[in-house]
Regions:
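Residue-level preference for the first positions of well-ordered beta-strands
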Residues: 29-31, 54-56, 96-97, 139
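SF2 helicase catalytic motif II
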Residues: 102-105, 110-170
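Conserved Walker A/P-loop ATP-binding site and its immediately adjacent core
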Residues: 41-76, 104, 152
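Conserved RecA-like helicase motor-core motifs
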Residues: 31, 76-89
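The conserved Walker
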Residues: 36, 61, 172
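Walker A/P-loop
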Residues: 26-47
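Conserved pre-motif I regulatory segment
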Residues: 1-33
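Conserved motor-coupling elements within RecA-like helicase/translocase cores
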Residues: 88-98
């Protein structure tokens, strides 16, 4: 179970989404379309917490990855909680909540070397599926999923065929 508790108050439209959580849980997926700045990241974090399983969050850029970490820290964690105990930004060192870019995921799925915004990672020989299974990841969150590039989509499709038991949260502005 993820120990995340939102410290703020929900906007009416956010509450409407969250009130349907049991429907999403039964369906195994949530697809949320909302305007930029409407709080999709916050809803995504709350849905992950409610699903209660280790989760993998995929984002289009390192900047957005950092925004997720910051939002978790400021809006969900109590003062005594350490973000590093709960969140990882590295597929090779997964935690209950692992947040990486689509590019890093693509590189790991295809066992490639990755270079992104000055961050280098070598996934040659790395078994992403085995690592996800060992971590018992059961929730996948796709942030800004309208930004998916063709090669990222192919990696996600291959992943979904091999890793079927996932609850999927898709967040998009279009």
């Amino acid at each position: 179970m993820l120990d995340l508790n939102f410290k703020g108050s929900w906007r009416q439209y956010q509450k409407q989404v969250l009130d349907r959580f049991q429907d999403y849980q039964a369906d195994g997926h949530v697809h949320l379309v909302a305007a930029p700045g409407s709080g999709k990241t916050t809803i995504g974090i709350e849905l992950i917490a409610r699903f209660g399983n280790p989760a993998l969050v995929l984002v289009p850029t390192v900047t957005i990855r950092e925004q997720w970490v910051d939002r978790i820290q400021t809006a969900f964690l109590e003062n005594e909680q350490k973000i590093s105990d709960l969140v990882s930004q590295n597929l090779k060192e997964m935690k209950a909540l692992t947040i990486v870019t689509y590019q890093a995921f693509h590189s790991a799925m295809n066992q490639l070397q990755s270079q992104e915004d000055g961050e280098a990672e070598d996934f040659v020989g790395f078994d992403l599926l085995a690592s996800l299974r060992a971590q018992k990841v059961a929730t996948l969150c796709l942030d800004e999923c309208h930004h998916l590039r063709n090669e990222w989509w192919k990696s996600l499709e291959a992943f979904r065929k091999q890793y079927e038991q996932l609850q999927v949260i898709s967040l998009t502005a279009t």
